[in-house]
Regions:
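A conserved beta-strand/loop element that lines the FAD pocket in flavoprotein oxidoreductases
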Residues: 4-17
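Conserved beta-strand-loop-beta-strand element in the redox core of flavoprotein oxidoreductases
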Residues: 20-38
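Short secondary-structure capping/turn micro-motifs that flank functional sites
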Residues: 19-20, 70
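Hydrophobic aliphatic residue packing
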Residues: 7-8, 28, 45
């Protein structure tokens, strides 16, 4: 509200394709949902999440020593939580963590919370990076590998043999 009242022009669902600094601002080529347009801006607030505009404008990006992990949301279905032995599932999960098959950051809830909560969960992908398409692709592949490890682990557990992926 404040931004709009102050004369800021917002454009959601778009991202910079190129940026060139001029003597009185920035010439920006943007692309997004059904648009491709060149605009001029006196000032730009880079909200890309990966400082894409900063890099395109020719400035150096500074990456902190710690970056926010990526998040992969998912949901499992086709099981009855009432028929799951929680103690056995917890023990199997603890063993999978101990053996290195699974990693603690790969499941936002505890294993029984995931099952009791209707199968909705999330994984934190430590080291996920979106600074360019190549490293973001690598991050996405690693995230899906972690998700599949969890899915395959669950399918081996009594009462979860027919579990299905509703969405990722």
């Amino acid at each position: 509200e404040s931004a709009l009242k102050s004369g800021v022009h917002l454009l959601y669902y778009s991202f910079p394709k190129s940026a060139k600094e001029t003597s009185d601002g920035f010439e920006v080529e943007i692309t997004g949902k059904s648009i491709e347009k060149k605009v001029f801006a006196r000032r730009v607030i880079d909200c890309t999440g990966n400082a894409a505009f900063v890099a395109m404008a020719g400035y150096r990006r500074i990456k902190g020593s710690e970056i926010q992990p990526g998040t992969l949301d998912f949901k499992f279905s086709n099981y009855n939580p009432e028929k799951i032995d929680k103690a056995a599932l917890s023990a199997a999960y603890a063993e999978a963590l101990k053996s290195g098959e699974l990693h603690p950051h790969e499941l936002w809830k505890n294993i029984n919370g995931l099952i009791a909560g209707g199968g909705k969960g999330a994984q934190h992908l430590v080291g996920a990076d979106s600074s360019d398409a190549f490293v973001q692709t690598d991050s996405n592949i690693r995230g899906r590998e972690a998700f599949l490890r969890l899915f395959r682990f669950l399918k081996r557990q009594k009462g979860l043999e027919r579990i299905k992926i509703s969405y990722v």
